[in-house]
């Protein structure tokens, strides 16, 4: 929007452009910045920042006649992020919610005084990447962004990790006295653990190895079910559809999608987190739970479902919310069946394929490097993959748990480098120039990967 730089929660295009929301959840402002940051990291195409673009008019929801450069749009966007931290902190205000639509706040006080731990972690990840990729183009923007993400890091650990467990939310009371929500100490919601902040804190490298280990144990004990990793350890309280804290989570009569807690978008992000920290025993097996093909071989308490469609959720077979409230643990013991939820919904299939290729098989390319960083279980030793990278057809063979990390392209050893994330070495990297010199556009190129234990 032209007045403050915020984005609508949802919007339509072209002749329907006047149809859009006039507010948004607290995380929405972050995603456009993440898109630009990811693009610059991949391409270093800084010319895009000089492209002139209109805004959306707050008055009539149409495009403005006035245009500004993308960098000016980003300037406005970052100002909005700064202006909407909880007072005296670098914690993003919850606003009208976050990714989980069912947890929209039920009253104005919660909207203004809550922060989502997941949104805070996403903001840290995005602003940090933007600071890094913008450095050689605009050092002032880089320094400004650095101050923000360092502040986010400090306040996340000061307020949200004041206890050993990351809360789902933080409510900032008078005198900046934090109250942890969806946390073992939370007596109001009756919910102890929330998945999204834990996995995003790993993906963003916001927490250290000791904290990662602690939260993996929590996920294993409280959030991992036979069919999927769940958003919370139990559903929000249901009392006839009356909202006390959250809207749809406490209103919905149907225990499906996010209300039923096994929302597959979040399960995929769990796979991404396990790849980031190097848990090969978790990556492949949890991807298998998503595919409906032969689902009963992987999830034995699954009911029959269509085999050629992506399902956005795995819903417990409860007839009422009260039944689910009393017997939710039967999903863990497999006494209760699970069924496929909404089909072919939103970006799920794309996120699924991206995690398979980019983070589990580990094939990633940026402006000058090809990285192969598999996080695969040892039973897939010898796996071969036919893959096309630009105009090069490749047969990639994965030799796992080797004593030496090396790569051969068409039988010849390649000089490699290795990058360390906060938790582990990330496979092997090859200069793209070398890759193109050693491969051909005709026929199949053999790429043999020899990789040590993750």
What are these regions (language model features)?
Residues 14-19, 95-117, 179-189, 201, ...:
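Active-site-adjacent structural elements in folded domains
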Residues 221-224, 251-259, 269-454:
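Non-catalytic C-terminal accessory modules of carbohydrate-active enzymes
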Residues 1-6, 30-31, 37-115, 140, ...:
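Active-site acid/base region of carbohydrate-active enzymes
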Residues 26-29, 43-44, 113, 188, ...:
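Short, well-ordered loop/turn elements at secondary-structure boundaries
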């Amino acid at each position: 929007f032209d007045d403050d730089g915020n984005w609508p929660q949802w919007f339509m295009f072209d002749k329907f452009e006047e149809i859009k929301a006039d507010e948004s959840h607290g995380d929405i402002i972050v995603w456009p910045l993440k898109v630009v940051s990811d693009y610059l990291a991949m391409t270093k195409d800084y010319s895009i920042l000089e492209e002139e673009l209109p805004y959306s008019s707050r008055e009539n929801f149409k495009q403005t006649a006035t245009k500004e450069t993308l960098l000016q749009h980003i300037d406005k966007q970052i100002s909005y992020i700064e202006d909407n931290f909880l007072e005296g902190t670098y914690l993003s205000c919850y606003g009208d919610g976050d990714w989980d639509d069912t947890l929209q706040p039920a009253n104005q006080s919660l909207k203004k005084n809550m922060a989502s731990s997941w949104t805070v972690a996403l903001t840290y990840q995005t602003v940090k990447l933007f600071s890094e990729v913008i450095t050689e183009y605009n050092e002032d923007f880089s320094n400004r962004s650095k101050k923000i993400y360092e502040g986010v890091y400090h306040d996340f650990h000061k307020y949200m990790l004041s206890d050993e467990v990351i809360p789902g939310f933080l409510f900032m009371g008078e005198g900046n006295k934090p109250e942890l929500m969806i946390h073992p100490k939370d007596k109001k919601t009756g919910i102890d653990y929330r998945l999204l902040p834990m996995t995003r804190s790993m993906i963003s490298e916001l927490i250290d190895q000791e904290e990662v280990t602690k939260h993996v144990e929590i996920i294993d004990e409280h959030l991992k079910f036979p069919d999927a990793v769940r958003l919370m350890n139990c559903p929000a309280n249901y009392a006839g559809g009356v909202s006390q804290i959250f809207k749809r989570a406490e209103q919905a009569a149907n225990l499906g999608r996010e209300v039923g807690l096994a929302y597959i978008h979040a399960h995929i992000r769990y796979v991404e987190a396990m790849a980031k920290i190097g848990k090969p025993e978790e990556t492949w097996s949890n991807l298998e739970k998503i595919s409906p093909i032969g689902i009963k071989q992987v999830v034995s308490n699954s009911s029959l479902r269509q085999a050629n469609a992506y399902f956005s959720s795995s819903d417990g077979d409860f007839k009422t919310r009260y039944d689910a409230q009393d017997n939710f643990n039967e999903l863990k013991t497999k006494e209760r069946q699970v069924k496929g939820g909404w089909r072919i919904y939103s970006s799920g299939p794309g996120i699924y394929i991206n995690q398979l290729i980019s983070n589990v098989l580990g094939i990633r390319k940026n402006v000058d490097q090809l990285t192969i960083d598999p996080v695969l279980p040892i039973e897939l030793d010898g796996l071969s993959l036919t893959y096309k990278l630009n105009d090069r057809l490749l047969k990639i063979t994965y030799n796992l748990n080797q004593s030496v990390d090396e790569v051969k392209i068409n039988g010849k050893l390649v000089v490699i480098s290795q990058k360390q994330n906060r938790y582990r070495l990330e496979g092997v990297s090859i200069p793209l120039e070398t890759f193109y010199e050693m491969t051909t556009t005709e026929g199949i190129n053999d790429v043999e990967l020899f990789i040590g234990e993750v």
